[in-house]
Amino acid sequence: MLMKSAHVLVWFRRNLRLHDNAALNAAVASGLPITCVWVSQRPSENHNPRQSLFHYQAAQELHTRLAAHHIPLYVVASDEDLLPLAAALNAHTVITDEAYTEAEIRQDNHLWHNFDQAGIALQHANDRGILAKSPLMDANGLPYTDFAAYKQAWLQAYSGQRPSETKLPVQIGQNVPLFPAHTGAVLPAYQQSGETAALTQWHAFKQNLVHYPITQNFPARKNTSLLNAYLSAGCISPRLLAAESLANRHFEWLDKLIFRDYCY
C-alpha cells in the first residue's frame, strides 16, 4: 500500500455522503490524488449496536460510490491507525469534518500534534452544520444564549452558504480495497441507511412541507421528517435542506434546522 506520489487523505466522520461534502471538495481542489478513510468506531461515541450498524451501512454505500471513481476508502479500527495509514499513503494533508464534542476536540488536538510531528497537515471543513460553529458570536464575542437573537444573526450570515456539487475525478492506478464485513450485531433496521435512502426520505418529506406548520404536531401520523439519523451520520447535507427550505419558503422547517445549528 506504500504510495510514492503525494496524496490527500479524506477522513470521513459524520459526513458520510458525496453530495455537498466540503471535505471532499477541498480534496478535489488540492489537485492531488484522493484516498479516503473511515474509522469504524469513534471514541466519543457510546457503544450503540444499532447506530454502529447504521453508520457501517452508510460507509459501505459510500465505499461503492467512491469505487466508481477509483477512489479507495480504507476502514481502520481506531483514530490511532490514521497516522500509519497517512504515512503509508504519502498523504501531505488529512482533511476531515469539524469536531464538535469535547471528546472529539481533545482527540483532534492529540492527532494534530502527531500529524504535525510527521509533517502532515490536519485540515477541517464544516460538514455537520449549515454554518460553521465559530462565526456566530454575540457583541461580547461569546456564543449566543438566546435563540431569537441567534436566529437573526444566523439569517444575516447565511446568504453565502449554499450546497455545492462534489465533482469527483475518475482516478487512474489506484487499487480499491474490499470493504470489511460487519462484525457487530445485526439488528432489524428501522430505516435503510446511506445517502441514497436519505435523499429519498427528504424528497418524500418535502412534498408535504407546505402542511408542516400544522402536521408537525402529530408525530404519531409520521408527519415528522424522519431525517434525524441521516443528519447525525451526515448522509445528507443540512445546507441542502436549508437551501431548498428557504427557496420554497418553508420557514417553520427552516427554524428547526437553525435550532439544530444553535444546539451545536
PLM regions and their residue ranges:
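Glycine/tryptophan-enriched, flexible segments
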Residues: 120, 141-264
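Trp/Phe/Arg-rich N-terminal binding region typifying the photolyase-homology
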Residues: 1-162, 249
